[in-house]
Amino acid sequence: KDLINIVEHKTNKLHLNYYDSSYILPQAGSFQAENAVLAIETIKNEFKNITNFQIQDGLDQWFWPGRMQQMAENIFYDVAHNSSGVNILTSDLFDIYNQKPMGLVVMKNDKIRPEIISLFENAFKELIISTIPSKDILSKNDIKSTKSLNNYQFIENLNDALGLLKNKQFDGPKVIFGSHYIAKYVYKFFDFSFDKGNI
């Protein structure tokens, strides 16, 4: 981990140095660097004669759905659902845009903890909370009865919440996050094929 140096981080590019080699991933997210290095080390162990050119050719095909996946200009979807993941996500977006993101969250009903509430308060310019019909997702009643969530705009219908987020005048990053349960809703709204990859 200490040997990884991120050189450049953009919405569609992560440029990293590892030992004396340089690699580029076609997807944002600082956590991708560790995943890439793990893949590189594994492939080098299996194929002793592989070149950096061949490795880069493989990395050019890199696609990880639901991980800082760009859905539209300045709009991302990420399955981050705990304080560690949300902290990395918001830090990465701040690094790229130099401003706090606007967020839309749908949460599992076991994820409301003080650390994540603190991130909601401090790491976002604005936050919208929504829900979907699922026994595992925080429901309207749960949200309304949780005092720490009452400071945020609640929009029960996820499609309406997505529309509001998309159309809101804001020149910084916007991110939908909190669960892989909402992937099919997000993909349908942004007209992405849900079959592009498993989440």
Q: PLM features: what roles do these ranges have?
A:
Residues 86-87, 114-116, 138-140, 185-188:
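Short glycine-/acidic-enriched loop or helix-start segments at secondary-structure transitions
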Residues 10, 19-126:
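Nucleotide phosphate-binding/pyrophosphate-handling subdomain across enzymes
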Residues 2, 63, 83-84, 110-112, ...:
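Short alpha-helical
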Residues 180-199:
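Glycine/aspartate-rich loop-and-adjacent alpha/beta segment that forms the canonical ThDP
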Residues 74-76, 101-103, 170-180:
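Generic beta-sheet signal
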Residues 1, 79-80, 105-109, 130-133, ...:
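Structural motif
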Residues 101-102, 125-130, 174, 194-199:
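Short hydrophobic/aromatic-enriched beta-strand-loop microsegments
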